[in-house]
Design a protein with these regions (language model features):
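Active-site neighborhoods and metal-handling regions in enzymes and metal-associated proteins
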Residues: 1-407
Length: 407
């Protein structure tokens, strides 16, 4: 915070599915709260009296929001509720010792309401500058980037859940009969992408996990568009690539895991095998070259080198590319599915984008040809940079392309 010249952090919103508040409080059933973290001082959590027990569980210094008489604040604001809330924030900041300087704002709120409140607060406190920070390198994300052993164990546990569910998915697909080149259910009706997704959500829920941002189960052309989640009505056809990218988190919005495999049911076409072999070669090469404190941009460049040598176009030569290597190599992972460190190209990288001890990140090279070949391929694992500099895949799972099915 001192380096960023911040007097305080102001975090608002629920604890669940709100990474800044979750990180500062440890989660819990807080449907709405505010937290002020002055530079060089302990944070203060402001809570609703209905959630006083949940607030107490955080172990933080707390303050009941009803101590600020909202009726009086509303009268002072002449009936303007937005201004009344801003007056309450003013009192909260002043009691926390924050009367001047830069205050960075975090959290999840309905933008329409909080925007008006912050505008009013800025007018009420002209010596305070309410600020945002560069998206990928905020103070909060920098703090979150290095994981301790407790955080690693939680991510590792989510990894075990993830690969268990992926294994169940493979078994589920393999257990089905085929008809006219596609999987069918026991009643003879086609199995669809939507059917598979419903099963995956159920398996996650049974393991106290969830996929709040969904996941990718995309077949054929959809597999060639990196973030296509797949079309629910699509049939599960043999010989078409399936990109299965699953990124669940702990129930209530805790730590994420991120994982991708590419499958082809029954058999793989020559085109699919060729693309898969190129991706796997690149994946294994890059994984074998990861080194402590190396710039992440080196590996983005290395991935471009490898794919270009195989004859594929990359975004290094064409930033508007839509076929070939059109995706970055990876990203950090934690309470967000995407966080620092970032695998950016050299012109966008910062000195913080390195493989530092305690980092958790994905490595996910892929090739995408939705229109010219009707397929795509990505392989992804989540890697922990251990304090001794070794790299650990937090949940191992086979890289096989072909999933056998019943005749």
């Amino acid at each position: 915070m001192q380096e960023a010249n911040l007097a305080a952090l102001l975090v608002t919103g629920p604890a669940a599915h709100n990474p800044p508040m979750y990180y500062m409080t440890g989660g819990g059933h807080l449907t709405h709260a505010d937290l002020i973290k002055p530079c060089g001082a302990d944070p203060i959590l402001f809570y609703s009296p209905m959630e006083r027990d949940e607030a107490a569980k955080t172990g933080l210094a707390t303050k009941n929001i009803v101590d600020y008489n909202f009726k009086e604040l509303l009268q002072q604001a002449e009936g303007d509720r937005i201004k009344a809330v801003a007056l309450r924030y003013q009192k909260m900041l002043e009691e926390a010792g924050v009367t001047a300087g830069r205050v960075s704002v975090y959290g999840k709120e309905e933008l329409n309401g909080i925007f008006g409140v912050l505008m009013q607060l800025q007018k009420l406190m002209p010596d305070v500058e309410l600020v945002g920070e560069p998206g990928g390198n905020s103070v909060m994300l920098q703090a979150m980037a290095t994981k301790d052993e407790h955080e690693i164990e939680r991510i590792r546990k989510m990894g075990k859940v993830t690969v268990e569910v992926v294994g169940l998915t493979a078994e589920f697909l393999s257990s089905h009969q085929t008809k006219n080149g596609a999987l069918v259910k026991a009643d003879g009706m086609p199995l669809t992408v939507g059917d598979v997704k419903r099963k995956v959500h159920l398996w996650l829920a049974e393991r106290d996990a969830e996929a709040p941002e969904g996941f990718i189960f995309a077949i054929g052309r959809d597999a060639g568009v990196p973030h296509s989640s797949g079309t629910d009505s699509d049939l599960i056809e043999l010989g078409k690539t399936i990109v299965y990218d699953i990124f669940p988190c702990e129930k209530g919005g805790g730590y994420y895991y991120d994982f991708t495999r590419t499958w082809s049911l029954g058999y793989a076409t020559d085109a699919a095998e060729s693309i898969y072999n190129d991706v796997r070669t690149t994946y294994e090469t890059v994984m074998g070259e990861l080194k402590l404190n190396a710039p992440t941009s080196d590996y983005q460049e290395r991935t471009c080198d490898l794919f270009e040598a195989q004859g594929h176009k990359t975004t290094r030569t064409d930033p508007a590319l839509q076929e070939g290597y059109v995706h970055s190599l990876g990203h950090g992972l934690g309470l967000h599915v995407h966080e620092a460190p970032w695998f950016r190209s050299k012109e966008y990288a910062t000195d913080k984008d390195i493989l530092f001890p305690g980092a958790v990140m994905t490595v996910e090279p892929g090739l995408y040809y939705p229109d010219s070949r009707g397929l795509g391929c990505r392989l992804e694992d989540t890697v922990y940079v251990r304090p001794d500099g070794t790299m650990e895949i937090l949940a191992e799972y086979p890289l096989d392309l072909v999933i056998p099915v019943k005749a």
